[in-house]
């Protein structure tokens, strides 16, 4: 191989290595974003479950009160 070909090959390899490093950094950022979103999603699911339980409790109370009103009428 000529020196020119080796130089071109070295340049391409260096560019490829730089691209790989950039992609690794982007991947790490995306992993962190994913982790943050997963935690937020978990919190929202827990909050949703709590609100559904509160709604069910209120529905029971309202149903009970409506039953009392109907029995008095």
UniProtKB/Swiss-Prot annotation:
KW Cell cycle (keyword) present: yes
UniProt xrefs under Pfam families: ZapB
Transmembrane parts of this sequence: none
Coiled-coil regions, chain positions: 3-69
Region annotation Disordered: where it falls in the sequence: 30-50
GO CC, any one term: cytoplasm
Alphabetized UniProt keyword annotations: Cell cycle, Cell division, Coiled coil, Cytoplasm, Septation
Top-level taxon of the source organism: Bacteria
Compartments it resides in: Cytoplasm
Biased composition (Low complexity): 41-50
The keyword Metal-binding is assigned to this record: no
BP terms from Gene Ontology: division septum assembly; FtsZ-dependent cytokinesis
InterPro entries: Cell_div_ZapB
Family (UniProt): Belongs to the ZapB family.
Function: Non-essential, abundant cell division factor that is required for proper Z-ring formation. It is recruited early to the divisome by direct interaction with FtsZ, stimulating Z-ring assembly and thereby promoting cell division earlier in the cell cycle. Its recruitment to the Z-ring requires functional FtsA or ZipA.
Quaternary assembly: Homodimer. The ends of the coiled-coil dimer bind to each other, forming polymers. Interacts with FtsZ.
Protein name: Cell division protein ZapB
Gene behind the chain: zapB
